[in-house]
Amino acid sequence: SDGLQNSSGHIGANTRYRLTRLGEQMARLPIDPKIARILLAAKKHDCMAEILVIASALSIQDPRERPLEARDTAAKAHERFTDKQSDFLAYLNIWDSFQRERDKGLSNKQLVQWCRQYFLSHLRMREWRELHHQLAQTAIEMGLTTKEAAFRQPPTQEQLRPSESQGDQDLAAKLKQKQLDKKQHRAQIRAAKEAGYEQIHRALLTGLIANVGMKSPDGNDYTGARGSRFHLFPASALFKA
């Protein structure tokens, strides 16, 4: 079956078509085997909080809306979340931005308005949060992580990635390093513990190895496994890279 083939391809089954211990763990996660494999790798690479956000995002329809009649406006609004290095990290920017708005104590109506402003589907954001919570709880029950490590705390304004703070005031210029109070100092320590690009992408590769390709020298096409060919989505931050 496709499910067994997927599991075997991600070392979830052995040559006798029996589930390995890894396969048994993958089967407990209510998501695609490829995404489940990524989630299990997150423990090894110490990036569980970040991968829980990304894995749940990859398991639902993209929360970003791109209506035909306002495509350019939507693209401009989505620039707030863009990460120039990785489309996967853009999911973290969306998640963190939404979490900060929730933490302000906004009403449901205000959150809906915020989503509309940035062309995000509020329904899909809610679906994302629900699946994230489900995956986090399952990961905790499986002993993959702890409650403290599973739930990502959004960076403070001082810790925003440069890509996420586009269009905002240059807060970094306002920071006076010599006058950091204790709260800001603790925030810097938390930021230092945040999983980095390499950790996150090493985990992602365990489930998405078939998506790795070599760019054609004469265009935007890529050659992947078994001679497959694909190209980047035009809305990707890497499309023109």
List the model feature ranges, each with a label.
Residues S1-A241:
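Second RecA-like catalytic domain
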